[in-house]
């Protein structure tokens, strides 16, 4: 499977609790934090839900 590089570009302060939990589920903790995840349907759904907070790059 392909991997995607996910970077948090906005703060989690003031976001919906579901969106904060989604960030934690992806393993993101702070602005500028980058993680590499497999490009699975579940990860794609999480990314789509909070795309306004993230920057996505394919590897």
Swiss-Prot record:
NCBIfam families, alphabetically?
A: rpmD_bact
PANTHER family cross-referenced by the UniProt entry? LARGE RIBOSOMAL SUBUNIT PROTEIN UL30M, MITOCHONDRIAL RIBOSOMAL PROTEIN L30
Q: Name one GO biological process term.
A: translation
Q: Which domain of life is it from?
A: Bacteria
Q: Which InterPro entries match?
A: Ribo_uL30_ferredoxin-like_sf (IPR036919), Ribosomal_uL30_bac-type (IPR005996), Ribosomal_uL30_ferredoxin-like (IPR016082)
- Which protein, by its recorded name, is this? Large ribosomal subunit protein uL30
Give the family from UniProt.
Answer: Belongs to the universal ribosomal protein uL30 family.
The encoding gene? rpmD
Q: Which GO terms describe its cellular component?
A: cytosolic large ribosomal subunit
What organism is listed for this UniProt entry? Buchnera aphidicola subsp. Acyrthosiphon pisum (strain APS) (Acyrthosiphon pisum symbiotic bacterium)
Q: Which UniProt keywords apply?
A: Ribonucleoprotein, Ribosomal protein
**Oligomeric form and interacting partners:** Part of the 50S ribosomal subunit.
* HAMAP family to which the protein is assigned, alphabetical: Ribosomal_uL30_B
Pfam families per record: Ribosomal_L30
Q: Where is the signal peptide?
A: none
Q: Which GO terms describe its molecular function?
A: structural constituent of ribosome
Q: Supply the Gene3D superfamilies for this chain.
A: Ribosomal protein L30, ferredoxin-like fold domain (3.30.1390.20)
């Amino acid at each position: 499977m392909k991997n995607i590089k996910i970077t948090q570009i906005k703060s989690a302060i003031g976001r919906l609790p579901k969106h904060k939990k989604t960030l934690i589920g992806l393993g993101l903790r702070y602005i500028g934090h980058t993680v590499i995840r497999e490009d699975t349907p579940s990860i794609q759904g999480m990314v789509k839900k909070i795309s306004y907070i993230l920057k996505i790059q394919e590897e």
